[in-house]
Amino acid sequence: MFRVQKELVSHEAVIVALFEEDKKSSFVQELDKAFEGQLQVLLEEKELSTKKKAISKVHSLGKTNVKRYYFVGLGKKESYTTETLRAALGKAFKALQAAKVQDAAILLDSFVTDKLDAIDVAHIAAEVQGLGTYELQTYKADKKDRVELEKFTAITAEDAQEIEAALTVGYVHGRATNSARTLVNMPPNVLTATKLAEYAVELAEKYDMDYKVLEKEEMEELGMGALLAVNQGSTEPPKMIALIYKGKEEWKDVIGFVGKGITYDTGGYSLKPREGMVGMKGDMGGAAAVLGAMEIIGELRPEQNVIAVIPSTDNVVSGTAFKPDDVITSMSGKTIEVLNTDAEGRLALADGITYAKKLGANYLVDVATLTGGVIVALGNHTTGAMTNNEELFEQVLEASMETDEPIWQLPIFERDKERVKNSKFADLNNSPGREGHAVMAGTFIGEFAEETPWVHLDIAGTSETSGAHDLGPSGATGAMVRTLATLVERFGEE
């Protein structure tokens, strides 16, 4: 699909950057020679816009071998960021898709500044080509034919091998994020814990990873009472899924990802209202993020050791379902008083984290659509984070900045720990109250990480979006897939 060339040949469409400073630049003047000065006229008439994210389509009318030029407005160079570039290219690729373009090119060097080099631009362009043109996988009888971009050429004076490598990495990041999106968008009668486990096994086998899928009997033997409690009301069997990637000869410095895999959450006996229940098929967004990251890791083969653990079940109501006031025993041996059956994700993660440690994880990152409280605190564009280790958090933060998936650290104070330990009957309670809800959930999970360096990522606000945006349609976003993978790729770098 991807090619690198030094000069333009014949293409259906070409993407070109247009900064505020480019109105009279030598670059525009050179391109304008073929248009006999018409580009300058369009700029002066403001029909060719340099405004951020503005997409201006110009037909060559046979003046060049390119049928259409798509000029991408990027504003002033001083305010140019990777986020600006991602959003603008997202709109550009949507425009190409709407025009059913199959052969396109990008004048890569037109996007290069002292802030972003050609490798950065190539990575982002290939990544966004997948993200921006993703479409919801529907179950409608009448399916529309989709025209795919079949050829994409980067025009640049830079080293072709380096640019090809950046295009490949970006493409893998985008494709894996879309894989996660598709998982989250699947209906719960299709994506059960069993089906999620089957997907994970196929992924592991494709990339020659080791894997384990624990069945209910094995979980009982290991004392995974927290996950099993959540599963009590269901006719669907639970699964504890583990993928093991060995990127080093020696099994050390193991990064452990733990993704919440609740395939549907009714709230249990602490039942959600109707309007709060619709959409709970997405409560396995953390599992999808982890699996998406493992897809990238499998493709790119970084020299790191990684474990991905997914505790999976649905949370439903029946005569056998767990109840408020129950006391359960987790795999760690810690007992938990259940005050809210709708705070089930942290119970599943408790056993998931303990199991990841058992498998040898030296560093932990859990990802979960955990609390409505984090949405109240941070909105729908920022993921909440908590940690017991600032050094590990800084690495996660740097990865999130590189991928433009912003995170914000929430605190853990001793008084928060005291609140989750406030129980007359057990070591912990799973829901101390609504105040500081996101912090309480993260603090609870931290009790199972114990001394192992750990970062908690609450993606309840960022996992899905209610409307179309520059990088995709409404629905799942694939939040944290690229951040987790980038963390592994950069782990330990100074």
Swiss-Prot record:
Keywords, in A-Z order: Aminopeptidase, Cytoplasm, Hydrolase, Manganese, Metal-binding, Protease
SUPFAM superfamilies noted in UniProt: Macro domain-like, Zn-dependent exopeptidases
Keyword Cytoplasm in annotation: yes
Pfam families in the record: Peptidase_M17, Peptidase_M17_N
Disulfide bonds: none
Cofactor: Mn(2+)
Enzyme nomenclature, EC number: 3.4.11.1, 3.4.11.10
Name of protein: Probable cytosol aminopeptidase
